[in-house]
């Protein structure tokens, strides 16, 4: 059977551009069909309501909503619509959503909250399209290299497998910490694991710095260097995960878990071997 997945992208976090791609990295899975709707960079209640209702009309087997701060007004509107739809739904968000995780569970929604997916330094005097793209590229590298991406991908794949097997979907309820992330990555070298953990914590700190620069500091001459320092922090976090991967490469021990054509998750470590 083919499982129909609905993905709602409202606003953007680092995981947003790759949430659909990580399920079908070579575009050759024959067991899923993905539909993506979104409201662009904005996530105001009216825009989120419009695309959420359109997604419900598509009647997918389950819905994945992804965007910043699931506790904000726009995402809360999506949560209301999805909870009332009767379609199994999971909310993927960043650390600010942790304070609402119990409320999401009470609504009958699953959640995957990523602590290393930081907010951007959204000050006009600093952030232009180039800076935005470079920041998100660094965040994606951290998500991938620490194992956070793999936790998200596995959670969604488990939902796919449940539908294929005719079972009731067990909605994920996950807060991704540095330990959860690196455990999913199957590091062989303990120094590589340590570097990935350090990168994860640096990404968490990036969020704290950007919150300070965007919301807690009013003087321009103060907040510009604050948000700039946050972006420098995530840049070095991305370099740290590169170093971790290079350590794994050096001993031919990079964990790779590609999808088979039927969606099964395969496994390999040595570069020249076939995944099984």
Swiss-Prot record:
Q: What is its EC number?
A: 1.5.98.1
Q: Which InterPro entries match?
A: MTD, MTD_sf
Which keywords does the record carry? Methanogenesis, One-carbon metabolism, Oxidoreductase
Which molecular function terms from Gene Ontology are attached?
ferredoxin hydrogenase activity; methylenetetrahydromethanopterin dehydrogenase activity
List the pathway annotation.
One-carbon metabolism; methanogenesis from CO(2); 5,10-methylene-5,6,7,8-tetrahydromethanopterin from 5,10-methenyl-5,6,7,8-tetrahydromethanopterin (coenzyme F420 route): step 1/1
Highest taxon in the source lineage: Archaea
Write out the similarity annotation: Belongs to the MTD family.
User: What does the record give as the function of this protein?
Assistant: Catalyzes the reversible reduction of methenyl-H(4)MPT(+) to methylene-H(4)MPT.
Q: What is this protein called?
A: F420-dependent methylenetetrahydromethanopterin dehydrogenase
Q: Which organism is it from?
A: Methanococcus vannielii (strain ATCC 35089 / DSM 1224 / JCM 13029 / OCM 148 / SB)
